[in-house]
């Protein structure tokens, strides 16, 4: 037996907020939405995937945002994305550079923490 890699990241969201998730993850972050399997659609939530990047947002009736645990997402042209996020009213917190990477944190519209990373050239 061998675990090879992470298949996807699951984040929780409140019920009935799929359009808000589509706006943030789809429009702002540019991750395309993919259809959920028919047998899972009744649960609510929405999935976004781009190649090996898979973020699944699932409805949690007792939703509480993940404020410390977070996925780290590699971004191309992070400075441009930071500008867009700030224009849209999101608070972006810059962190110390580590491993020659520019790193910031932002909360999605539900309060889930995301780390956005771009390797410095």
Language-model segments: what does each one mean?
Residues 1-4, 88-121:
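Vicinal oxygen chelate
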Residues 4-5, 63-68, 98:
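Short glycine-enriched loop/turn motifs at secondary-structure junctions
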Residues 40-44, 65, 98-102:
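Short acidic/glycine-enriched loop/turn segments that link adjacent beta-strands
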Residues 33-35, 57, 91-94:
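A short linear hydrophobic-aromatic micro-motif
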Residues 1-22, 69-71:
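N-terminal beta-strand motif that seeds the catalytic metal site of vicinal oxygen chelate
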Residues 67-85:
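Mid-chain, well-packed structural core segment of small domains
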Residues 11-54:
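Core segments of cupin and vicinal oxygen chelate
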């Amino acid at each position: 037996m061998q675990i090879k890699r992470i298949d996807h990241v699951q984040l929780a969201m409140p019920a009935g907020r799929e359009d808000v998730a589509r706006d943030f993850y789809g429009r702002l972050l540019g991750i395309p939405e993919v259809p959920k399997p028919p047998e899972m659609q009744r649960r609510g939530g929405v999935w976004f995937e781009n190649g090996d990047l898979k973020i699944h947002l699932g409805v949690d009736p007792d939703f509480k945002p993940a404020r410390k645990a977070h996925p780290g997402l590699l971004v191309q042209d992070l400075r441009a994305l930071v500008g867009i996020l700030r224009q849209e009213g999101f608070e972006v917190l810059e962190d110390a550079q580590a491993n020659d990477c520019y790193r910031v944190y932002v909360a999605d519209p539900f309060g889930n923490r995301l780390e956005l990373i771009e390797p410095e050239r």
